[in-house]
């Protein structure tokens, strides 16, 4: 589990010392505790190298198609606070005991569906659907995927399918309305302030719904256009952001 950034958290090789990686990779089982050398081997392999077919590297180390699909879902939902977004943390790595392939499992996805998050992070304009390289520190696995024509083509195929299957505005907004209806009454007595920590301008639950719907519409329109005509690779906006502490009941987070 990676809860905070540190050596190797962006899946970039940080040297041979296993202790360095333990600063951010927390083993959750006895098997994982004994497998730090294997983790470092994974990170080294994912770094690629000259005259290496990265499609083969990724496929030999990870469940590649699942990772590509996850990249697309995180982008469409604006989940920037994890490895395939801006910040190299908030994920688990799981290795299947039989296939020995690794899977990437993002977690703590509480800052999605918010553009200009915290008033700073360009979640839509800075995260190109056809060139999925957001800001933050370098992430070799994403860079190598984008540089590999077959992997990039596979990612775009998955992204188009996911966008049309799950992120069409009429579908997603209808689901949002149904989910809100389920919790509307309990929210009347909820002790937390009626705003999202990502959106300082929220003024109530109707405002929150409106900002989420605007995100859904803009993200879909731009992603559809970008996947239809990828164009040239854009420059990466190298901005990272650590979310503030979560608000406490009856209080607002500091500005």
Regions inferred by a protein language model and the residue ranges of each:
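Phosphate/dinucleotide-binding and metal-coordinating scaffold of catalytic cores
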Residues: 1-255
């Amino acid at each position: 589990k990676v809860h905070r950034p540190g050596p190797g958290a962006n899946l970039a090789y940080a040297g041979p010392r296993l202790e360095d990686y333990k600063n951010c990779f927390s083993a959750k089982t006895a098997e994982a505790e004994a497998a730090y050398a294997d983790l470092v081997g994974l990170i080294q392999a994912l770094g690629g190298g000259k005259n290496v077919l990265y499609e083969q590297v990724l496929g030999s180390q990870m469940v590649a198609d699942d990772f590509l699909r996850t990249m697309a879902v995180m982008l469409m939902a604006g989940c920037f606070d994890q490895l395939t977004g801006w910040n190299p943390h908030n994920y688990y790595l799981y290795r299947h005991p039989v296939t020995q392939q690794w899977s990437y499992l993002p977690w703590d996805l509480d800052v999605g569906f918010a553009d200009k998050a915290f008033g700073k992070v360009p979640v839509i304009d800075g995260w190109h659907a056809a060139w999925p390289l957001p800001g933050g520190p370098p992430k070799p696995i994403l860079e190598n995927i984008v540089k590999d024509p077959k992997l990039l083509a596979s990612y775009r195929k998955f992204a188009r399918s996911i966008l049309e299957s799950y992120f069409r505005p009429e579908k997603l907004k209808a689901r949002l309305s149904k989910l809100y209806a389920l919790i509307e009454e309990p929210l009347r007595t909820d002790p937390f302030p009626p705003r999202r920590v990502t959106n300082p301008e929220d003024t109530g639950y109707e405002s929150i719904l409106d900002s989420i719907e605007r995100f859904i519409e803009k993200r879909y329109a731009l992603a559809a256009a970008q996947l239809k005509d990828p164009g040239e690779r854009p420059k990466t906006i190298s901005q990272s952001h650590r979310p503030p502490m979560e608000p406490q009941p009856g209080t607002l987070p500091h500005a």
